[in-house]
Curated annotation (Swiss-Prot):
PANTHER family: SINGLE-STRAND SELECTIVE MONOFUNCTIONAL URACIL DNA GLYCOSYLASE (PTHR13235:SF2)
Chain intervals for the UniProt region annotation (Disordered): 1-27
GO biological process: base-excision repair
Organism domain of life: Eukaryota
Annotated binding of substrate, by residue: 86, 100, 165, 241
Function: Recognizes base lesions in the genome and initiates base excision DNA repair. Acts as a monofunctional DNA glycosylase specific for uracil (U) residues in DNA with a preference for single-stranded DNA substrates. The activity is greater toward mismatches (U/G) compared to matches (U/A). Excises uracil (U), 5-formyluracil (fU) and uracil derivatives bearing an oxidized group at C5 [5-hydroxyuracil (hoU) and 5-hydroxymethyluracil (hmU)] in ssDNA and dsDNA, but not analogous cytosine derivatives (5-hydroxycytosine and 5-formylcytosine), nor other oxidized bases.
Matching Pfam families: UDG (PF03167)
Annotated GO CC locations: nucleolus
Principal subcellular localization: nucleus
GO molecular function: DNA binding; DNA N-glycosylase activity; oxidized pyrimidine nucleobase lesion DNA N-glycosylase activity; single-strand selective uracil DNA N-glycosylase activity; uracil DNA N-glycosylase activity
InterPro entries named among the record's database cross-references: SMUG1 (IPR039134), Uracil-DNA_glycosylase-like (IPR005122), Uracil-DNA_glycosylase-like_sf (IPR036895)
Protein name: Single-strand selective monofunctional uracil DNA glycosylase
Enzyme class, broadest EC rank: hydrolase
Length: 272
């Protein structure tokens, strides 16, 4: 594994190739980000999946109100660091529209709310209850709980950082089991992640991101692949995923995360 480079200080390096129009004013940055997400939604609607996938949830559509509140409140200016997840979990973003969106954190720490509609197709084993969902998402509770303890207030975290998922879709088997993008047949997987990779490049440039931290190895690898040719000046690093399925994360993810952020030189950006 390559030795991580400390997070650089100083002015942001401009991309070698123009991917989009110059960055808008802070007032319209959130609007521009939301427009990019809607553009991605349009592209994703054109995709078709095999019988392996029974139902597709897109919380950026049916949980638009809390998702829009998240972006407009916390993405008002350029971001140096983007923490990148892979795709929604059934009890996190699928319920709240917020990446790693553990209900209690979204409601009580991020201060977000709003109506969440029922998806066009809803699996009986995966009901969408929005902020009324009683089940906790362990990954989200660990992720946001760590930053709540570290930063104190969400405004401290979001001064320089933002959290986003590469793919907005939750894929469910006919049984209701969660299907990761990695489980899709190769052609479908590359079609899906190809459009998400292209969207990521546009989003990274829009926000002025200098460092992408992939939360989990898959997100890190996809970010490297997406940005390597179009935006090679953007640094990509990884952070252990806080999943309860990870024995290493279960031994103390918070300590691992803090050590990793210290290696990357990010702690000064995350403390007041």
């Amino acid at each position: 594994m390559a030795v991580p480079q400390p997070f650089p200080s100083g002015p942001h390096l401009q991309p070698a190739g123009a991917l989009m129009e110059p960055q808008p004013s802070p007032r319209s940055l959130a609007e521009g980000f939301l427009q990019e997400e809607l553009r991605l939604n349009d592209e994703l609607r054109q995709l078709q999946f095999s019988e392996l996938v029974g139902i597709v949830y897109n919380p950026v559509e049916y949980a638009w109100e809390p998702h829009r509140s998240y972006v407009t409140r916390y993405c008002q200016g350029p971001k140096q660091v983007l923490f990148l997840g892979m795709n929604p979990g059934p009890f996190g973003m699928a319920q709240t529209g917020v990446p790693f969106g553990e209900v209690s954190v979204v409601r009580d720490w991020l201060g977000l709310g709003g109506p969440v509609r029922t998806p066009p197709q809803e699996h009986p084993k995966r009901p969408v209850l929005g902020l009324e969902c009683p089940q906790s998402e362990v990954s989200g509770a660990r992720f946001w709980g760590f930053f709540r303890n570290l930063c104190g207030q969400p405004e401290v975290f979001f001064r320089h950082c933002f959290v986003h998922n590469l793919c907005p879709l939750l894929l469910l088997a006919p049984s209701g089991r969660n299907i990761t993008p990695a489980e899709l047949p190769a052609k479908q997987r590359e079609q899906l992640l190809g459009v998400c990779d292209a969207a990521l490049c546009r989003q990274v440039q829009l926000l002025g991101v200098r460092l992408v931290v992939g939360v989990g190895r898959v997100a890190e690898q996809r970010a490297r692949r997406a940005l390597a040719s179009l935006m090679p000046e953007v640094q990509v690093e990884g952070l252990l995923h806080p999943s309860p399925r990870s024995p290493q994360a279960n031994k103390g993810w918070e300590a691992v995360a803090k050590e990793r952020l210290n290696e990357l030189g990010l702690l000064p950006l995350l403390t007041s």
